[in-house]
């Protein structure tokens, strides 16, 4: 099974959307294997968004992601990286497909509620930034036989 990294950004936390967002992934059948609320330091934010260093929006992105608490999580399931991205919707909420998290809750590209890894490689890197291996829990769920063949 694949794992991916998701983060409810400060706007999602401040607006009280944590539970609704987590529920969408659980209802889809994905298993949460790591979950924590945290305040991201500037150093961690710069490492996380390192691929954007030097771009005009980099400092604003780092400022925003460190402006309040976030909820970091790792979810597991079949094709979870691709499907989670589809569930989140386009980066710009105004262009996101109806029913996606960003279309439902977002109103501005700079306040788009959630981050999700865009590839397996990114997921592994981001999980390593935000979680120690002992913080990720492997466990069996009774419902898995009803979700996967």
Swiss-Prot record:
**What is this enzyme's catalytic activity, as reactions?**
a 2'-deoxyribonucleoside 5'-diphosphate + ATP = a 2'-deoxyribonucleoside 5'-triphosphate + ADP; a ribonucleoside 5'-diphosphate + ATP = a ribonucleoside 5'-triphosphate + ADP
Q: Where in the cell is it found?
A: Cytoplasm
Pfam families per the UniProt record, alphabetical? NDK
Q: What class of enzyme is it?
A: transferase
Coarsely, its chief localization is cytoplasm
List the GO terms this entry assigns under cellular component, sorted alphabetically: cytoplasm
Q: Which residues form a coiled coil?
A: none
Q: Which SMART domains match?
A: NDK
Alphabetized InterPro entries for the sequence: NDK-like_dom, NDK-like_dom_sf, Nucleoside_diP_kinase, Nucleoside_diP_kinase_AS
Q: Provide the transmembrane region boundaries.
A: none
Task: Give the enzyme's EC designation.
Answer: 2.7.4.6
Q: Which residues hold ATP?
A: 9, 57, 85, 91, 102, 112
**What are the GO MF terms of this UniProt record?**
ATP binding; metal ion binding; nucleoside diphosphate kinase activity
Its function, per the record, reads: Major role in the synthesis of nucleoside triphosphates other than ATP. The ATP gamma phosphate is transferred to the NDP beta phosphate via a ping-pong mechanism, using a phosphorylated active-site intermediate.
To which protein family does this belong?
Belongs to the NDK family.
- Quote the protein name from its UniProt record: Nucleoside diphosphate kinase
Which gene holds the coding sequence for this protein? ndk
